[in-house]
Amino acid sequence: MSPTQEQLIALGGVFQAAVLVDRIAKTGQISEAALSCMLGSLLVVDPKDTLDVYGGDDLNLHEGYRAMASALERDPATLQREPLRYALSMLGLERQLAKRDDLLEVIGKRIPVIQSQVEHFGIAHENVIAATGALYQDTLSTLRQRIQVQGDMRNLQQPNNASKIRGILLAGIRSARLWRQVGGHRWQLVFSRRKLLKELYPLLHG
């Protein structure tokens, strides 16, 4: 797997999270498989490669790849505006988080606790969803930059949906951190669009 492919997979995780957050906000529903993949990505500590973080299957990131492609193509007809805004916000929040050792320490201590809950209840159980949402609130929600989620207030005000959104945002920011760790930089999204698209299309249509 090339370095660019590794970066695209991690960035696909960011965009996948963004698409799912947008869907919960607007419809109140996402599949359990999609939720499980994103929350599960928080718990993978020793992946053999980047795709392993997302269950080892590109299909798990297909919607994220599609949203990323529309952003890189800059086609107004297909551009998913809200997911793009969320994805860019997650990249920005990750940069802020990287400077906060205290928050990283909190996350590092609480992820194993969530892992033990998963072993007891299962990944998509409401207790696990609540725990990931609370971890986001206690760490990333304290930063100056906030992600403003737009959608139907009836969906956003349901506690379980709010926890799902926060948990998925946490997973998206974990993906943003992974993207940076495998060599991703924001300038690539501006200056290397064609190269990224050339390597993204096989992932999207594979």
Swiss-Prot record:
The keyword Disulfide bond does not apply. Keywords: Cell inner membrane, Cell membrane, Cytoplasm, Membrane. It comes from the Bacteria. The keyword Cell membrane applies. SUPFAM superfamilies: YcfC-like. InterPro entries: HflD (IPR007451), HflD-like_sf (IPR035932). It is a peripheral membrane protein. Its main location: cytoplasm. One of its GO terms (cellular component) is plasma membrane. It is found in: Cytoplasm; Cell inner membrane. Belongs to the HflD family. PANTHER family: HIGH FREQUENCY LYSOGENIZATION PROTEIN HFLD. This is High frequency lysogenization protein HflD homolog. The gene is hflD.
